A protein has these predicted regions:
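Conserved beta-strand hairpin/beta-sheet module of binuclear metal-dependent hydrolase folds
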Residues: 125-185, 310-315, 319-325
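N-terminal export signals
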Residues: 6-28
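Metallo-beta-lactamase
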Residues: 134, 158-169, 221, 226-404
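Feature captures hydrophobic
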Residues: 33-36, 481-496, 500-507, 512, ...
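Active-site metal-binding motif and surrounding structural segment of the metallo-beta-lactamase
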Residues: 157-158, 168-219
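C-terminal segment of N-terminal export signals and the immediately downstream linker at the start
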Residues: 1, 22-45
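Divalent-metal (often Zn2+) His-rich catalytic cores of metallo-beta-lactamase-fold enzymes
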Residues: 39-59, 330, 349-410, 414-449, ...
Length: 620
C-alpha cells in the first residue's frame, strides 16, 4: 500500500505548480525565471520591476495552449450595443471619483503585455466594453458601469430592474443612460435582488425612492431569508472583509500593465455610496411563479450556491433565462478570498442542472448579473452543461483525492480542471481559481486541519519566525539565499524563507523589498485576477505601506439602518469588546413601535451579549 506522500508524488501534477493553459509548469522547470532586480522606468512604483525571463516564459507557454480560435465571446459581448458610456468617470455625491473607466484604456492599446497573463488580458479586454445594450426587444442591460450589470425588463407600467449595481451613483448614471435612449420616461415599476451580495443591491437608492417602496408603489422582490444572510455575510465580518477586499479586488492598486488590470467579473468595484432597501416580497418556494408588473416570471430558488440565498428567473413569454450569478463567463468562487462561508459546489451543480432541464431546453437567450448574454438554445445548453460539470467535478475529484490522503495544504498542487473544460473560456478561472477553490472544498467537508498535530495549536507567525531566522543563520543568510532563489525563478521557494524574515523583523525594509519583488513576479504569472491582485497589492504595501483612498463600505450606516432590530443587536454584540465589560450585568427589553418588534437583550455573564425575540411583561 502506498503512503500518502508516495501517492502524491506519483500524481502528474505533483510539486508546486502553476496551471497554465491546460497543463502545469513546475516551479523548478526551465519555464520559469530570469533576474529582475533593476527598477522599471514604466512601472507605477519606483521600486517596481519588469517581468523576469522565467515569467516571460510562463506567459509565452500560456499563449500557445489557450483556445484563442474560439471567438464567440467577442461577438457576444458587443452584440446589441445601443449607446456607449460617453463620460468615462462617474462622480460620487461625496465629491470623489466613484467610477473611472478611463484608467483601463491602456488595455486596448496593445494586443499583448509582458506582465499580464494572456488569458486574463483577454477577459479584461472583454470587460472593457461599456454602455447600454439590447439583449432582446424588451430586455436591456447597462454594462461596464460597475463590477456587476444592471438589467431592465419592460413591464406593463414601467421597468423591472434586476440587480441595481454596487453604489447609488453608478446605478443612477446607468438609469440616466437607459432613459436617454430606451426608457421612454417610464418609471421603475419593480426591483428584483437576485441574491445577497452587495453588488446586486447596493445601488438601489440610485434608481428608486424608498417612500415609493414603503407605500407599495414599487415592490422589491428577493429570495427568502435575504436580509438575514445579507447582514450576516456583508456586515457581521464587514471590517475584516473590507480589508481582505484590498487584496482580492486590488481596490487601491494602480491600474496599469504592472498593477491592476481588472477583476474578472467586471473591471472594478465602484467607490460610491452603498445603500439597502429591505425587500417587500420574498420568493419562498423552490419554484414560484407570479406576475411582476404584468410580466409572468418563474423564480427558481437556489440556496447555498453562489450565495447563501439566490434565485434564477425565467420569463416564459420572452424565452429569456436570467441566471443571476450562478452561471457567468468564468469559474466562480467556492471559497472567496475576501472571506465568506465556503460554498457547496455539488449543490450548485445540481441547481444549474435543474435550470437546464426546467428552462434551458427552450430558452433562446440567457443573461446574468455579470458579463454578456448568450443567444441561441445550443449555446445556452453548452454553457449550462459546462458550468454544471465544472462544479460537480471540482467537488467530486477533490474529495476523491482527500479520501486518498491529500490534505488541504497539498490539494492545490494536485487538483486539475479536466482538459475538456479547460478549453472552454467560460470554465477558466477569472474569479475562482482551481488552487483556492480546491482548498475550499476540503475546508467545507473537513475543515482547516491537515491531520498533522503540529498544526493544531501552532505558534503565531510573529512568534515562530524569529526561531526560523535564528536556525537559518540570521537575516543576511536568508536575504542571500532568498535573492538567489528569486534570481533562479524559484519564487515560491523564495517567498517561503523571506516571509519568515519579514514576520520576524517587520521593520526590515530590505527584506520587505525582496519579498515584494518575489510577489510581483508571482502576480504577473497569474491568470486569476484575485491571485494577481493579492500578490501585487501585497508587493505595493510592502514597498509603500497601506494605501489610502476611497472605497465602498458594505457596513455603511444605510445598510445598518436596513437591519431588523434583532440583526442590529446581533451586530452590536460583535462590535462590543467583552474584555471591557467584565462585571457588567444588565437586561434591556425593547419595543420598536414602528414595526411592533419586541426583544430582550441580556448581559448576565462576562462572555457575550445575547438577544432574542420575546413578549416582555414590562418593557422599558
Amino acid at each position: 500500500m502506498s503512503t500518502r506522500r508516495q501517492f502524491i508524488q506519483s500524481l502528474p501534477a505533483a510539486g508546486t505548480a502553476f496551471a497554465v493553459a491546460g497543463h502545469l509548469v513546475l516551479e523548478d522547470s526551465p519555464a520559469l525565471g530570469q533576474v529582475a532586480t533593476v527598477p522599471l522606468k514604466e512601472h507605477f512604483h519606483p521600486k517596481g520591476k519588469a517581468p523576469s525571463k522565467y515569467t516571460l516564459d510562463v506567459l509565452k507557454q500560456a499563449r500557445t495552449g489557450l483556445p484563442f480560435a474560439d471567438q464567440r465571446d467577442l461577438d457576444e459581448q458587443k452584440r446589441g450595443l445601443i449607446a456607449p458610456m460617453k463620460d468615462l468617470k462617474i462622480m460620487a455625491d461625496a465629491g470623489h471619483v466613484a467610477w473611472d473607466m478611463e484608467r483601463f484604456q491602456f488595455l486596448d492599446k496593445q494586443d499583448e503585455f509582458d506582465s499580464i497573463h494572456p488569458s486574463l488580458l483577454r477577459q479584461s479586454k472583454l470587460n472593457n466594453n461599456y454602455g447600454l445594450y439590447e439583449v432582446i426587444p424588451g430586455i436591456y442591460q447597462v454594462r461596464g458601469f460597475d463590477l456587476s450589470d444592471i438589467s431592465f425588463v419592460r413591464g406593463k407600467t414601467g421597468w423591472i430592474v434586476f440587480d441595481p449595481l454596487v453604489t447609488k451613483e453608478t446605478a443612477r448614471a446607468a438609469w440616466k443612460l437607459f432613459q436617454q435612449h430606451v426608457g421612454q420616461g417610464m418609471p421603475v415599476s419593480a426591483v428584483i435582488y437576485s441574491h445577497t451580495h452587495g453588488d446586486h443591491w447596493g445601488g438601489v437608492r440610485g434608481i428608486v425612492d424608498e417612500a415609493d417602496v414603503r407605500s407599495g408603489k414599487v415592490p422589491v422582490i428577493a429570495p427568502i431569508d435575504f436580509m438575514d444572510f445579507t447582514i450576516s455575510e456583508n456586515v457581521y465580518a464587514g471590517n475584516a472583509m473590507n480589508r481582505r477586499l484590498f487584496y482580492q479586488y486590488g481596490l487601491l492598486l494602480p491600474a496599469s500593465p504592472h498593477g491592476y488590470v481588472g477583476q474578472g467579473l467586471g473591471q472594478a468595484v465602484s467607490a460610491g455610496a452603498i445603500g439597502l432597501i429591505a425587500p417587500t416580497r420574498y420568493v419562498e418556494k423552490a419554484i414560484e411563479e407570479f406576475e411582476v408588473d404584468g410580466v409572468r416570471m418563474v423564480f427558481q430558488n437556489t440556496p447555498n450556491t453562489e450565495a447563501p440565498r439566490e434565485m434564477n428567473t425565467y420569463i416564459p413569454e420572452m424565452k429569456a433565462l436570467w441566471m443571476a450569478e450562478n452561471v457567468i463567463a468564468s469559474l466562480h468562487n467556492i471559497y472567496t478570498l475576501r472571506g465568506a462561508p465556503v460554498r457547496d459546489p455539488l449543490n450548485w451543480s445540481k441547481y444549474i442542472g435543474e435550470a437546464l432541464f426546467r428552462f434551458g431546453l427552450e430558452a433562446e437567450v440567457m443573461f446574468a448579473s455579470h458579463h454578456w448574454p448568450r443567444w441561441g438554445n445550443d449555446r445556452i445548453q453548452e454553457v449550462l452543461r459546462g458550468q454544471r460539470d465544472l462544479y460537480a467535478h471540482m467537488n467530486n475529484q477533490v474529495l476523491h483525492f482527500a479520501n486518498q490522503g491529500v490534505t488541504i495544504n497539498e490539494i492545490h498542487n494536485v487538483y486539475e480542471v479536466p482538459k475538456g473544460l479547460q478549453n472552454k473560456w467560460f470554465c477558466r478561472g477569472y474569479h475562482g481559481s482551481p488552487q483556492h477553490n480546491s482548498r475550499g472544498v476540503i475546508q467545507r467537508y473537513l475543515g482547516f486541519w491537515d491531520c498533522n498535530p503540529t498544526t493544531l495549536i501552532p505558534l503565531s507567525p510573529g512568534e515562530s519566525a524569529p526561531l526560523y531566522v535564528e536556525m537559518m543563520g540570521g537575516a543576511q543568510k536568508i536575504m542571500d539565499r532568498g535573492r538567489q532563489l528569486h534570481d533562479e525563478g524559484r519564487y515560491l521557494h523564495a517567498q517561503e524563507i523571506v516571509n519568515k524574515l519579514v514576520q520576524a523583523e517587520p521593520q526590515n525594509q530590505a527584506a520587505k523589498d525582496l519579498l515584494a519583488d518575489i510577489f510581483e513576479q508571482l502576480g504577473y504569472q497569474q491568470e486569476n485576477p484575485g491571485l494577481r491582485n493579492s500578490y501585487l497589492a501585497a508587493a505595493y504595501e510592502l514597498r509603500t505601506g497601506i494605501p489610502q483612498g476611497e472605497t465602498a463600505n458594505s457596513s455603511s450606516p444605510d445598510v445598518i439602518r436596513a437591519m431588523s432590530t434583532e440583526l442590529f443587536l446581533n451586530f452590536l454584540g460583535i462590535r462590543m469588546d467583552s474584555r471591557k465589560a467584565e462585571g457588567m450585568r444588565f437586561t434591556i427589553n425593547l419595543i420598536t413601535p414602528d414595526n411592533g418588534e419586541k426583544l430582550s437583550s441580556n448581559w448576565k455573564t462576562p462572555h457575550s451579549l445575547t438577544s432574542r425575540v420575546i413578549k416582555p411583561k414590562n418593557p422599558t
